[in-house]
Amino acid sequence: MTEKYKKEILFVNSFRGSGIGDFGWKLKSELEARLQIKYVEISPSWKGLVRLWKTLTRCNLQVIFNLGFTSFGKSIYRNFFNFMMLKLYSTVHPLQSVILHDSIDTSNLEYSGYSNSRLLPVGGAIATIMLKNYNIFVFSKISYDILKKKYGIKNVNYFPFPAENETVLECYKQDKEPLLLNMGYIAPYKGLEILPEIKTKLNNIKTIIVGNFYGSLLSTKNGPKFKQELVTLMKDSGIKMLGYMDDARLIELVKEYRTVAILPYVSGYNASYSAIFFLTLGIPVVATNLDTFLESRNNGAGIILVNRTPDAFAAALDMILNSSDLTRSLIEDDKKYCAHYSIHNFCDFLIDVSKSVTFGSP
């Protein structure tokens, strides 16, 4: 698209610091190249939510929402209220566009780190039904099928999880010291507790975790205990936990080593921001053979999937570290994935579909 769309659009993004909000911030740059954008960011508080809906009721712009669906801990009631407001808003302004990143139906609540109430799936189903009058975009074929078949939502659009760039940076350095790297906010379902055993099986390979503990998790009854136990385990195993890094610092770290990404998830949501981000850096990824990663691999991503055991992960990682042919093949797959499914291409898809369904004529 070479000419900007003439109408101003309101882009409502989830808060930054989460994978969803960070994705939205990058999408904002793409949208601004094509549309006249008014940007609003959701603040994770009741006050912020009230402020958001005051803004929405006072403006008469077409809207694109970038939202996460699942919300746990103390934020669950606030998130449910937000979906009630979305329902009310859609009765006055139908077929607004929603980018929906995850779903209660594809979440394994047992490993979320939060109390697993029987009411949670019920509330999630009710919240999903509230979106029936929206034009929804998802990054998971599983979510697409659930929204269409289980909930009967008509306007659902699927696009594989977008890569940040159309080209791969190729940060993998065969001649440098090997490094296992995990990145993303820290929660029980990420399965990090098996990293020490994998590290040992690979001759105590240097291992680093980048990311903060998820804030709402730490406010739960078991959250502080989970954090303390994991920090102690990693410290005793010689695994560094470096906290959050912006993209520039993370890329610097990756380039210092022969970096291989490791994602030993116990369960996963619809798409892994971390996995696709690693693809854009051109570094190999080894992940648990979950549906979320299998879908990315089936779409062409250079990801090796294994059973979630230390032996299986260690064997795959050792194979990568000792085979330049394999790493080259994986990186070539990454290049093809990024070229087809970049955030640039998704933005074009989002606008084209939204214009035909929601925006009307320019």
Residue ranges of model-derived segments:
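Conserved acidic donor-binding segment of nucleotide-sugar-dependent glycosyltransferases
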Residues: 299, 303-311, 319-325
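Acidic donor-binding loop of glycosyltransferase active sites
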Residues: 254-270, 283
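Nucleotide-activated donor-binding/catalytic signature segment of Leloir-type glycosyltransferases, i.e.
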Residues: 223-251
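A charged, aromatic-enriched C-terminal amphipathic alpha-helix characteristic of glycosyltransferases
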Residues: 324-355
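A conserved mid-protein helix/loop that constitutes part of the nucleotide-sugar donor-binding site
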Residues: 22, 26, 187-201, 276
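Membrane-proximal helix-turn-helix segments that form the acceptor-binding/catalytic region
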Residues: 84-92, 116-136, 229-230
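Donor nucleotide-sugar binding/catalytic pocket of nucleotide-sugar-dependent glycosyltransferases
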Residues: 131-168
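Conserved donor-binding/catalytic core segment of Leloir-type glycosyltransferases
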Residues: 173-190, 196-199, 208-210
